[in-house]
Amino acid sequence: MNYRPLGRTGLKVSALSFGASSLGGVFRPVDEAESIRTVHAALDLGINFIDVSPYYGATRAETVLGRALRGIRRERYYLATKVGQYGEGEFDFSAARVTRSVDESCARLGVDYLDLVQCHDIEFADLDQIVGETLPALARLRAAGRIGHLGITGLPLRIFPAVLDRVEAGCIATVLSFNHYELNDSSLADLLPYFGRLGVGVINSAPTGMGLLTERGVPAWHPAPPAVVAGCRRAVEFCRARGVDIVQLAIQFAVANPAIATTLVGTANPAHLERNVAYAEAPADPGLLEEVLEVLRPIRNHNFTRGRPENRDPILA
């Protein structure tokens, strides 16, 4: 496993990290014992960064993860969770709620401090509140030793400079972006030099586009435009015809960029996790990668957006 610095946090994180949303049964019904085995397998394979949220499975993911981590030395892993989103359409970024949220997460996870706490999907928030209320409340917890570092997460890329440009240097240590550094959409790359100048660590999530780049395909709720779904399906079939699982290429593409500290993958299946780690540790076939990127060129960087109107990215026609 390769390890990279997470911005200026002083943390060296595995290039592939564990997204614990699957432990909450977000994508399919999961067995708790299997979920716990998956967490243990991740640590044994060298993954040292775990990301979760109280939103995933209505706190179930944090609860199961806490059980999995029971008895494991705290120095073996870095633990990140989130505040602000607690149910479908249920957001509360007030100082009182996020302060209480940190205490609740620590209790569920069985820890007395968190390495990273992130404001969850801030495109649904008033960014004035994030800057003026939420982050100062979390900074007080950081000063008290409950939190190591602060981060922000979301889908629209515009939200990151919209907040980072308004806070003191060092206030925000990380950004978590998803669906914007994958085979069909690498628009996050445009912001990487900016994050680098600020010393902000970049966490990439959803390298398969939340199912777009998989044999199984997208779930019914997936918001991608039909043209994007169809274009990704062509890439899946192209890889299949060449005897390659497109997930392999997607993971290899995501972890190859040294400006991205870590890429999150989520699964509650130990065998799938072992497969993903093996993919990440092997280089991509450059010829195949070039061919697949060409297949995807007509939909390149075409994606969906969401959030408050003022926080949304423009959509390519």
Identify the meaning behind each predicted range.
Residues 122-299, 303, 311-317:
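Beta/alpha (TIM)-barrel catalytic core signal, keyed to glycine-rich beta->alpha loops juxtaposed to Asp/Glu
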Residues 1-77:
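N-terminal binding-site loop/beta-alpha segment at the start of enzyme catalytic domains
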Residues 29-42, 93-109, 156-165:
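Short, acidic/polar
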Residues 6, 18, 35, 50, ...:
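Conserved, mostly hydrophobic/aromatic
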Residues 21-33, 83-97, 125-126:
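Active-site mouth loops of central-metabolism enzymes
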Residues 106-125:
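Active-site groove signature of glycoside hydrolases
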Residues 11-16, 46-48, 73-77, 111-115, ...:
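Short, well-ordered coil/turn segments that N-cap beta-strands
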